[in-house]
Design a protein with these regions (language model features):
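Aromatic- and Gly/Pro-rich donor/ligand-binding loops
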Residues: 2-150
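Active-site-proximal region of nucleotide-activated glycan assembly enzymes
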Residues: 123-127, 131-189
C-alpha cells in the first residue's frame, strides 16, 4: 500500500449556507474517496475555507462515511489581505504549515466564482490563495468551475497568471472555456 496522500481543497466549502456549494464539496470528496479505494491509497483532506466549523465537519464525515481524522477544515479568510496576515501571524503560520503538507491542491472556487463579479475583496482573496499555492510549488488543479467575466483588466491578468500556472484546468461549461481562450493559451481538459 502506498503512503497517505494529502489533498488540499481550496474554494470547496463545508461551513457555508449555500447548500449547492456544500453539495459540490461532498461530490468531490465522494469521488476522491472512490479513487482512494480503487488505488488502495488513503487520502487525508484539508478543506481550506473561510472559517472552520467542527459540527458541520462531523456531519459531512457522517454523511459521506469518511473518518473524522481524514477531513480537516482550515480557515483561510485571514490570508485574503496582508493586513490580516500581519494581525494574525500565528493563525497565518498554522494555515501555511498545513498548506505545505499538501501533495496537491484542487480548487473549485465554489463552482461558479472565478470572476470579479462578486467584488474585489472576494476575487483578490481567493486568487491570492491560489497564487500562494503555486508560489509554494504545490501542483494546483483548477477543478470544474466557471471562469469570468472579469470586469477589470488587472483582474483578468491576475486570473490568467493563475490559469497558466495551474497543473490542470477544467471548465464547467463550454462558455467558460471559450471565454478563457480569448486571453490565455492554456488548454482545458
Amino acid at each position: 500500500m502506498k503512503n497517505r496522500l494529502i489533498i488540499g481543497l481550496e474554494g470547496a466549502v463545508i461551513n457555508n449556507g449555500n447548500m449547492g456549494c456544500v453539495a459540490l464539496t461532498c461530490s468531490i470528496l465522494n469521488m476522491l474517496e472512490k479513487i482512494s479505494k480503487e488505488l488502495s491509497t488513503p487520502i487525508t483532506y484539508f478543506v481550506f475555507e473561510g472559517e472552520e466549523n467542527s459540527v458541520k465537519n462531523k456531519n459531512i464525515c457522517k454523511l459521506l462515511q469518511i473518518q473524522e481524522e481524514q477531513i480537516y477544515s482550515v480557515p483561510t479568510r485571514h490570508l485574503y489581505r496582508i493586513r490580516s496576515m500581519i494581525r494574525h501571524p500565528i493563525k497565518t503560520e498554522k494555515t501555511i504549515h498545513k498548506m505545505r503538507k499538501c501533495d496537491v491542491f484542487i480548487d473549485l472556487t465554489e463552482g461558479d466564482s472565478f470572476s470579479d463579479i462578486y467584488g474585489q475583496y472576494r476575487f483578490n482573496g481567493g486568487t491570492n490563495v491560489k497564487l500562494l499555492i503555486e508560489k509554494m510549488g504545490i501542483p494546483l488543479i483548477l477543478g470544474p468551475q466557471t471562469y469570468g467575466p472579469f470586469n477589470k483588466e488587472c483582474n483578468k491578468k491576475k486570473a490568467k497568471k493563475v490559469i497558466e500556472s495551474a497543473t490542470c484546468v477544467m471548465a464547467r461549461d463550454q462558455m467558460s472555456a471559450e471565454y478563457v481562450a480569448n486571453f490565455s493559451e492554456k488548454r482545458f481538459m
